[in-house]
Amino acid sequence: MWLDHIKYHGPMRTHQLVLSWIEAELSEGRLTVGGRLPAERTLAEQLKVSRTSVREAIRILEAMGVVRAGVGSGPEAGTVVISDPTAALGSALRLHVATQHLPVADIVETRVLLESWAASKASPQAPELEAAGRLLEEMAAGGLDVDEFLALDVRFHLALADAAGNAVVSAMMGSLRESIQRYAAQLTSNLPDW
């Protein structure tokens, strides 16, 4: 039984049982990206938990960027497994930056470290480097408002991270950029050139 594979760390809330089941199904390959979770009622009956616990687990997984839940009927209905680690990491970092537990300067320093590593690991022929070069040219051309410039800047830095071919570094870079995007926009809008 799937429950036999869960390490016991004390009492578990019922939504955590649902999360553990979904993790086990993903790990074993029975659920994959693009696949659908069983219907809420079916899952609740199968795991012997309330539908409220299933809904809570699904909301948590949505926030983590693991599933997308659609209501109603048709092709968009149901809960589909997705993979968007940047969303969850970015949200968590942004909240911790807002609490001032994670200083913006530390986020920027981490971003620079990861980006430097990614640039050093990238193949000179990586198409992402060519894309980054085009983005730099667009930024240097001028005539951009703050929002346009920042959008190009984000794409430039993400292209550098992607050039290394490391999915974790790419996700981390996206999350780090997202976590300080509001602060960057505030700082940039105060520059005399804009």
What is each stretch, according to the model?
Residues 11, 15, 146, 194:
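Flexible, glycine- and charge-enriched loops at secondary-structure boundaries
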Residues 1-113:
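Short linear motifs at protein or domain termini
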Residues 43, 82, 96, 129, ...:
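Hydrophobic alpha-helical segments
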Residues 107-186:
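Conserved amphipathic alpha-helical segments that form helical-bundle/coiled-coil interaction surfaces
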Residues 188-194:
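Short, intrinsically disordered, charge-balanced linker/junction segments flanking boundaries
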